[in-house]
Amino acid sequence: MSRIGLKPIEVPQGVEITVDEKNIVTVKGPNGQLSEKIHRDITVETEANVINVVRPTENKKHKSLHGLSRTLVANMVEGVTKGYEKKLELVGVGYRATMQGKKLVLSLGFSHPVEIDQPEGLTIEVPSQTQVTVKGIDKQQVGNFAAKIREYRKPEPYKGKGVRYAGEVVRRKEGKTGK
């Protein structure tokens, strides 16, 4: 059984946390500000430099919400201090990525280039033509945008061509063997 919800969250210096009456937790830090609505049954207690997330009962629903709420708050604290990044690699002949102003332009073997607008709160870097880095303070937003980019051309199992996360292992298949 997981006991993630019972762990206290360390608050680094320079991070300010507020909880209002509607159970909305706001975290301000050097990189920005994030807020998240926590379920009404879960209470968030802030002390000097420690946050405790408390559940009212031991039933299954409250235990699940407890771990979720604690992780959401911990991710917000880490996001406003360190930030998150997701790296993507483009594998395939002619697969390229470039930045044109605030747009990410991908050449992925389609008859047209794929243009994706940079969302608010995220920064996109293209260190080389085959690498894309998505950075931001909101872990969920970074992951969703990286998944959106990957969705345009997932790695295929025969040659491994496509957009993949850095370090992702693509399971390869053997092609058909002729007679």
UniProtKB/Swiss-Prot annotation:
User: InterPro entries annotated for this entry?
Assistant: Ribosomal_uL6-like, Ribosomal_uL6-like_a/b-dom_sf, Ribosomal_uL6_a/b-dom, Ribosomal_uL6_bac-type, Ribosomal_uL6_CS
> What GO cellular component is one of the record's annotations?
cytosolic large ribosomal subunit
UniProt entry keywords in alphabetical sequence? Ribonucleoprotein, Ribosomal protein, RNA-binding, rRNA-binding
Q: Which GO annotations describe the biological process of this protein?
A: cytoplasmic translation
User: What Pfam families has UniProt attached to this entry?
Assistant: Ribosomal_L6
Q: Does the keyword Disulfide bond apply?
A: no
GO molecular function term, any single one: rRNA binding
- Could you tell me which HAMAP family the record lists for this protein? Ribosomal_uL6_B (MF_01365_B)
Q: How does it assemble?
A: Part of the 50S ribosomal subunit.
Q: Give a short account of what the protein does.
A: This protein binds to the 23S rRNA, and is important in its secondary structure. It is located near the subunit interface in the base of the L7/L12 stalk, and near the tRNA binding site of the peptidyltransferase center.
Under NCBIfam families, the record lists: L6_bact
Describe the family membership recorded for this protein in Swiss-Prot or TrEMBL: Belongs to the universal ribosomal protein uL6 family.
**What's the name of the protein?**
Large ribosomal subunit protein uL6
Q: Which organism is it from?
A: Alkaliphilus metalliredigens (strain QYMF)
Gene name of this polypeptide: rplF
